[in-house]
A protein has these predicted regions:
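Membrane-proximal soluble regions of multi-pass membrane proteins
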Residues: 35-125
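Multi-pass membrane catalytic core of lipid/isoprenoid biosynthesis enzymes
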Residues: 87, 94-153, 230-232, 236-237, ...
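Functional transmembrane core segments of multi-pass inner-membrane proteins
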Residues: 5, 18, 149-257, 300-307
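Interhelical loop and helix-boundary elements at the membrane-water interface
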Residues: 36, 80, 103, 117-126, ...
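Hydrophobic transmembrane alpha-helices of multi-pass small-molecule transporters
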Residues: 134, 138, 189, 259-266
Length: 307
């Protein structure tokens, strides 16, 4: 019996595997959310300095210092800094995190939310992201079962989690995630996995154009930029995965969610109206809901409208 057959015959095992897998993926996503924006900023600074032809020694020193943020030595040689190296360390005492301390959720509970060396508090966001990713992975496994759809739905879910968190913290939606997500959505439509190729192509084009038109209209009226180009690309990616027919649902859900949370932030946290609120997290939430229950929501709405 193959592993796939075993998972098909045992739903409980499938759910357990996906939950545990989600915990470890969530742990990796914490690294992505923290490091990817730093990697992007380092690249931008290096490219700008090269363009301006600044002194190469100054460029090397500043890039190494600003990118890693963890190295306090005087060596001017830039140290490797990516999603794999250097090893994760405490931002307070710079002590390396051991293997067992990387165990999702459990290690945070054992350490009582503090560094094992200096006792500096560890943000509760880390275990919450791990739990969120695990719960979403569990829901996806319950929805799709042991199928090809499950594999791609998990990739879709994990990508949206990382994009939502990065945009929430930095107001950035990295092309290194959104563009592969877009192309993968178009590629799997050839099978098709979720929607047909024509639906995916039209969905991607329409997703980009809808927000581009909104952006240009808002800018024409107010003279300000209401959103970033990353939002266009993310909605295009959602259109490629979900098809053009679910775009109205995604836009409606994301707008409602954004409006409700925005009002709550202004009332409860005195959030200034002029202060930018990232739209990516709401698109990600709406896109995931549309993947999971979009057909049922649309059917319920059209049924109530008598269509």
């Amino acid at each position: 019996m193959t592993l796939f057959s075993l998972l098909q015959s045992s739903p409980a095992l499938l759910l357990s595997v996906c939950f545990v897998l989600g915990l470890f993926v969530g742990s990796f996503l914490n690294v992505v959310v923290y490091r990817l924006p730093l990697m992007m900023q380092t690249t931008w600074r290096r490219e700008c300095k090269e363009f301006l032809q600044q002194d190469s020694q100054e460029t090397t020193q500043e890039t190494a210092t600003e990118s890693a943020g963890e190295n306090s030595g005087t060596d001017q040689t830039p140290q490797p800094f990516n999603l794999m190296v250097p090893r994760s360390a405490c931002p307070s005492c710079n002590s390396m995190i051991t293997a067992w301390q990387n165990i999702p959720v459990i290690s945070w509970l054992i350490l009582r939310g503090k560094c094992g060396n200096c006792k500096h508090p560890i943000s509760i966001e880390y275990p919450l992201v791990e739990l969120l990713t695990a719960i979403l992975s569990l829901a996806v496994a319950y929805k799709f079962g042991a199928s090809i759809q499950l594999i791609f739905a998990l990739l879709f879910t994990w990508s949206l989690v990382s994009l939502a968190l990065i945009d929430f913290h930095t107001t950035l939606l990295p092309d290194s995630i959104t563009l592969p997500l877009l192309w993968l959505g178009l590629l799997i439509s050839l099978v098709p996995v979720f929607v047909s190729a024509p639906d995916a192509i039209v969905g991607a084009a329409a997703g980009y154009m809808i927000l581009w038109i909104v952006f240009q209209t808002f800018k024409l009226i107010t003279g300000k930029e209401g959103m970033g180009f990353g939002d266009f690309k993310l909605l295009a990616a959602l259109g490629a995965w979900l098809g053009w027919a679910k775009l109205p649902l995604v836009i409606l859900l994301s707008s409602l969610t954004g409006a409700i949370i925005g009002i709550m932030m202004m009332v409860l946290f005195k959030h200034q109206r002029s202060q930018a609120i990232p739209f990516g997290p709401y698109l990600a939430i709406a896109g995931w809901i549309a993947l999971m229950w979009g057909d049922q929501i649309v059917a319920m709405y059209t049924g109530q409208m008598g269509l």
